[in-house]
């Protein structure tokens, strides 16, 4: 066989590799869909809002049991609602948007890597992203972050293709359009615009290397039009929302508008009231674990990046500069969550790919990665074994969470330990992909079924049904989470999600006082202590989310509640299709 034939044969391998890589991605991302319900903290909230959209026809103003939810714009909830209307199952609908957006993100990384380098680098970049711990975690969660990561990646894709591949303004405008879509999904969708900063630096320092400059007229108008396109995308939701609020003359809608435009954007960033972390939180506590395996490779990758930047390689400078700016942007804000920096991960995989072939051949890196897998595997195995032999700490955990997952940990740990044995000779780095595939395969099937009862209040409502039957009854929720709305087979009322607990208790007492038929209060046992209710008349209905829940009937009312009477608004919800 001559050299030309060998080259053709080698080239033809890549389409097969690409196909099987995306098959693997689809399996890892979609496995487990339909096997579990929405789990706290955020999933039940978004699922309930989406379900309510379909049931009520109110799509512009997200609500949870009639109370408006101003924390996030509605795009992500629209996507869940669309699939719920299509399939009629919240179990299927709630995970599909994140899964599909994650697949699109993988494709975008593959395509731009291929255009900037070659198919080989594209395969490596896509594999690195797919096998990054945080990426898969969010791909399999119904949180907004996988979707906003997708829109931000489209923005970065459009700008990189515009700056470095082909001079067509449509890519520039596409980037800004999806920045706008990102903003009405979650406020930080504008982040790709930060890539203009390293681009301008590159243009100033290496003007002879600037492809865009050679093909661009000096007019600033086309550049400014990008911002106009972004505003047009934002206005798709923003303008109708403002018009509807103005015409409604509803104070609660005006409060919704002000909250989502100001408190949940500027105030939340500059003066956050929760998730307070130090400036170095992402560098010390998030990146080392959640960006595995790339995080381990950073000591070897940084010299490669430095060398590329010295040569003026915009393929590295632009994404890397953008990643640094994104990390700085989120680090400056006092409120931090690990998931906030997810949008930087696709670009990190992109700039790691050209050099990862060299990195995996480093013995120290390969052994380090294998060592991480070994420690995690032994930890899983040891944890499972401790439960089997009834170690005291394991029994305490079992009692606390009401769960006996010991065989799951034992089997999963055994399989991943087998992975370390198989990869202890030869290419040690292969331990990571085998480990991650095994872990997610086990967790998304067996693990989901184990956690289902613990992560939902189904058992509580099952016990309520045993106590009061299926007759017409309305349950008032006090100091609750959204999953109690989502899983309730009964009509429910509540007194405002953020209303102080004592006000909720007073309002619940007044509500119950009005009639002695068909009304019940579901409340944490610790709140039955203020003289409004008789503790001995409270009926235990079980534990959920580490809380002991009790059911109060009219007979549990005391003669007089010492709490101050309140005019708190009462919200109600009648489930059309209860989640089962």
Model-predicted segments: where are they?
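Short acidic/glycine- and proline-prone juxtamembrane loop motifs at membrane-interface regions
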Residues: 95, 134-148
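Extracytosolic helix-loop segments that constitute the early lumenal/periplasmic catalytic or substrate-binding loops
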Residues: 27-32, 45-68, 75, 82
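Membrane-embedded architecture of ER/inner-membrane glycosylation machinery
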Residues: 2-6, 10, 16, 173, ...
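Transmembrane-helix motifs of polytopic, lipid-linked glycan transferases
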Residues: 96-116, 154
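Transmembrane-helix signature of polytopic, membrane-embedded enzymes
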Residues: 15-23, 109-131
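Specific aromatic-rich, kink-prone transmembrane helix
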Residues: 108, 148-165, 348-351
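Membrane-interface transmembrane helices that cradle and orient dolichyl/undecaprenyl
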Residues: 115-116, 155-172, 182, 356-360
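Transmembrane-lumen/periplasm boundary regions of multi-pass, lipid-linked membrane glycan transferases
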Residues: 46-49, 178-181, 190-337, 347, ...
């Amino acid at each position: 066989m001559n050299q030309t034939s060998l080259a053709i044969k080698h080239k033809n391998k890549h389409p097969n590799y690409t196909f099987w890589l995306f098959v693997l991605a689809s399996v890892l991302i979609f496995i487990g869909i339909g096997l579990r319900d929405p789990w706290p903290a955020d999933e039940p909230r978004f699922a309930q809002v989406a379900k309510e959209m379909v049931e009520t026809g109110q799509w512009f103003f997200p609500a949870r049991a009639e109370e408006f939810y101003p924390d996030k714009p509605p795009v992500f909830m629209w996507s869940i609602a669309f699939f719920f209307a299509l399939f009629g199952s919240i179990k299927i609908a709630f995970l599909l948007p994140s899964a599909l957006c994650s697949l699109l993100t993988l494709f975008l990384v593959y395509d731009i890597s291929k255009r900037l380098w070659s198919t080989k680098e594209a395969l490596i970049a896509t594999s690195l992203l797919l096998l990054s711990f945080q990426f898969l975690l969010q791909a399999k969660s119904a949180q907004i972050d996988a979707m906003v990561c997708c829109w931000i990646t489209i923005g970065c894709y459009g700008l990189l293709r515009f700056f470095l591949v082909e001079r067509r303004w449509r890519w520039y405008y596409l980037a800004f359009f999806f920045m706008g879509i990102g903003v009405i999904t979650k406020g930080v969708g504008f982040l790709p615009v930060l890539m203009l900063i390293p681009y301008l630096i590159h243009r100033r320092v290496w003007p002879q290397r600037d492809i865009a400059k050679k093909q661009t007229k000096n007019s600033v108008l086309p550049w400014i039009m990008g911002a106009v396109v972004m505003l047009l995308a934002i206005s798709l939701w923003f303008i109708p929302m403002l018009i509807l609020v103005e015409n409604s003359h509803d104070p609660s809608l005006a409060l919704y508008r002000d909250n989502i435009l100001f408190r949940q954007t500027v105030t939340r960033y500059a003066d956050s009231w929760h998730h307070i972390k130090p400036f170095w939180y992402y560098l010390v506590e998030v990146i080392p674990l959640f960006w595995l395996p790339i995080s381990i490779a950073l000591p070897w990758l940084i010299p490669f990046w430095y060398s590329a930047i010295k040569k003026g390689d915009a393929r590295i400078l632009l994404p890397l500069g953008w990643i640094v700016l994104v990390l700085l942007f989120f680090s400056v804000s006092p409120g931090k969550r690990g998931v906030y920096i997810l949008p930087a991960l696709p670009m990190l995989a992109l700039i790691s790919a050209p050099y990862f072939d060299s990195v995996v051949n480093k013995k120290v890196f390969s052994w380090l990665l294998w060592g991480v897998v070994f420690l995690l595997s032994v930890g899983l195995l040891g944890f499972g074994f401790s439960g089997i032999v009834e170690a005291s700490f394991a029994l305490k955990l079992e009692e606390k969470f009401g769960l006996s997952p010991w065989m799951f940990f034992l089997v999963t740990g055994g399989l991943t330990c087998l992975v370390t044995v198989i990869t202890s000779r030869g290419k040690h780095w292969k331990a990571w992909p085998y480990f991650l595939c095994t872990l997610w395969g086990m967790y998304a099937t067996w693990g989901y079924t184990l956690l289902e009862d613990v992560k939902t209040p189904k058992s509580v409502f099952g016990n309520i049904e045993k106590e009061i039957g299926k007759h017409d009854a309305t349950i008032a929720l006090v100091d609750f989470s959204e999953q109690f709305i989502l899983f309730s087979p009964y009509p429910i009322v509540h007194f405002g999600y953020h209303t102080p607990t004592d006000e909720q208790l007073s309002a619940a007492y007044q509500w119950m006082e009005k009639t002695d038929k068909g009304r019940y209060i579901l409340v944490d046992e610790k709140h039955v202590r203020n003289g409004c209710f008789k503790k001995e008349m409270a009926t235990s209905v079980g534990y959920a989310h580490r809380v002991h829940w009790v059911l109060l009937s009219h007979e549990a009312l005391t003669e007089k509640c010492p709490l101050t009477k309140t005019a708190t608004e009462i919200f109600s919800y009648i489930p059309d299709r209860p989640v089962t």
